[in-house]
Each structure stands twice: as structure tokens, then as C-alpha cells.
């Protein structure tokens, strides 16, 4: 008996949400990818798609059509979604093979993380203190930037923090990372001071009409509800422009900056991996390439053997 694809993808999403407990963002991405595949097959077959329709040739045709309009990174993610779906089908005894596993992932150009200099990072983090706006919001923003840069949090981890996740007396915060894995992250002295100052004014962030406030969330918006990822991204861009002339600054760049500066300061790669919550050390090792690039740039500027022959002749 063949199975309707829509019913199977619905069960898979239920599995991801309730058993795997993936983040809402990840759940949405998986669902969107599988819905796109089902729509592609339905249009080609002229009837609702079934699992039997998903052979290697059909999947290759779908990826070929996608390759004309999405980036290699998006293409790789969509293929990963389908592979995960088939892996689940196999575990449930609903499929005997995984045709998606036979397809090659697109080659991705490895991008080095973008980061700020120490001076620019300090200017961005301090920008809220001299910016216009309500003081409670500015103090909140200063605390958030200290956490993003000082503790290297992902923006999703930052907005997910609750008040009871903080343990300022122990100088640490409990963070819920990817795959809902918990880790303890140290909080530096500047971040602790910024948090203390913000918490003293947090009560001012409540709904202007009802006076209601989310009593659980650490970082609140002006209406007293949990601050969202998009709002934090907008705020980081604002302070990036004010502090360092970087209106394109993304919260993840502050995380990259944290890791890069720790590595430059002599921190152990394994310790940085634990701090950032990376599952694989290879992810953390990207920062060694950044530091090596910096070292080469300094070498080219400073070492006499690195100078071009013409430059050396001109000095003789």
C-alpha cells in the first residue's frame, strides 16, 4: 500500500516537534522544503503525490529545477530535509531505501566568519548608552549586546532566555541551544554589570494600556512581551551603524567576533567549542583560518622578506 505524501510529511513534522523537539524555525524550514517537493511532484503527476513518486530521478529533477532559482546553500539544506525525512521513514518501517542519500550535495564555498576589531566591538556594545530613546530600552540593548559579544550567544538563544536562567552570583547563564541542548555559559564582568543595571529598570517595560508584562522572559519589548529575533537584528544593525559605521551588522557577527577575539587571546579551541555550543570541533576551527589570515596580513605588512622586490629595491 502506498502512502499519501502529505500525510507522511505531517507525521514527520509531528515527530520533529514533539519527539525531537526541534526549534520552531527548524520545524518551519523542514515543512516548507517538503511542501515544495510535494507541490513539484503533484504538478508533474497531475495528482496528489505519494511516497512511491519520490525516486532518485524525480528528486534529481526537483533539485535541478531548484538550482536555477536558489543558492547552493539553500539547495543543500532542502536536500538535507528530504534525507532526514527518508531516514525517518526507514526507521518507521515505511521505506526500504533512501533515494535522497544517493544524490550529491552541491559544493559550497566555505565562507570565513565576519567579525569586528576589538575597538569596533567596544564601540558597538557601548552605542546604546549614548543613543536617543527610552532609558529602560537602551539599558536592555546594552545588556543584550554585552551577552551577544561577551558570551557569544546565538540570537535565538538570547531571546529565549528567561529570568531564572540567570545565575549572576555564579557568573553564568543557562542557555538552550540547537537541538534544545542546554549548556552553562560564563557571564563576564561587563555583561553582569549591564544586566544588573537593566534588571533594575526592567519593570518599566510593560504594555502601555494594560500594564501587563511577561514576568518570565529576560529581555522584553516596549509592550512587555518577549523580544523577538527580528527586533534584535534591527537593533544590532542600528547600533552597528551608530558605533562602527556598520549598518549591515548581524547578531551572528558579534558571536563570531567573540570567538575570534578569544582565540587571538590564547583561548583553547575546545573551550571555545564548549562556550559556543558547537557539536563539531570543525565548526569552531573556522576561526583558526580567520586568525591565520590576520597573521598573514601582518606578516605581509611587517616582515622584510614578505615585501615585493620592487619595494625592497626602492629602499636600498
Locations of regions flagged by a protein language model:
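Conserved catalytic core of the tyrosine transesterase superfamily
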Residues: 1-316
Amino acid at each position: 500500500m502506498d502512502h499519501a505524501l502529505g500525510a507522511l510529511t505531517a507525521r514527520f513534522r509531528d515527530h520533529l516537534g514533539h519527539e525531537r523537539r526541534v526549534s520552531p524555525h527548524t520545524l518551519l524550514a523542514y515543512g516548507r522544503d517538503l511542501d515544495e517537493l510535494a507541490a513539484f511532484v503533484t504538478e508533474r503527476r497531475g495528482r496528489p503525490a505519494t511516497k512511491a513518486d519520490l525516486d532518485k530521478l524525480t528528486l534529481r529533477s526537483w533539485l535541478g529545477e531548484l538550482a536555477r532559482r536558489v543558492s547552493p546553500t539553500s539547495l543543500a539544506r532542502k536536500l538535507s530535509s528530504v534525507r532526514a525525512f527518508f531516514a525517518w521513514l526507514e526507521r518507521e518501517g515505511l521505506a526500504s531505501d533512501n533515494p535522497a542519500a544517493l544524490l550529491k550535495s552541491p559544493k559550497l564555498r566555505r565562507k570565513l566568519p565576519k567579525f569586528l576589531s576589538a575597538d569596533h566591538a567596544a564601540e558597538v556594545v557601548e552605542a546604546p548608552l549614548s543613543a536617543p530613546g527610552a532609558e529602560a530600552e537602551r539599558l536592555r540593548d546594552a545588556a543584550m549586546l554585552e551577552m551577544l559579544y561577551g558570551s557569544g550567544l546565538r540570537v535565538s538563544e538570547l531571546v529565549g532566555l528567561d529570568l531564572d536562567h540567570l545565575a549572576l552570583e555564579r557568573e553564568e547563564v543557562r542557555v538552550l541551544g540547537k537541538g534544545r541542548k542546554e549548556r552553562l555559559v560564563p557571564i563576564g564582568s561587563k555583561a553582569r554589570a549591564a544586566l544588573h543595571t537593566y534588571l533594575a529598570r526592567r519593570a518599566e517595560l510593560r504594555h502601555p494600556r494594560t500594564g501587563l508584562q511577561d514576568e518570565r522572559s529576560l529581555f522584553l519589548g516596549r509592550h512587555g512581551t518577549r523580544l523577538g529575533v527580528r527586533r534584535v537584528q534591527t537593533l544590532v544593525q542600528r547600533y552597528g551603524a551608530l558605533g562602527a559605521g556598520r549598518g549591515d551588522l548581524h547578531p551572528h557577527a558579534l558571536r563570531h567576533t567573540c570567538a575570534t577575539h578569544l582565540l587571538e587571546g590564547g583561548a583553547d579551541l575546545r573551550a571555545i567549542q564548549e562556550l559556543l555550543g558547537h557539536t563539531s570541533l570543525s565548526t569552531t576551527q573556522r576561526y583558526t583560518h580567520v586568525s591565520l589570515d590576520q597573521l598573514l596580513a601582518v606578516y605581509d605588512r611587517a616582515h622584510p622578506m614578505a615585501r615585493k622586490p620592487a619595494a625592497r629595491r626602492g629602499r636600498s
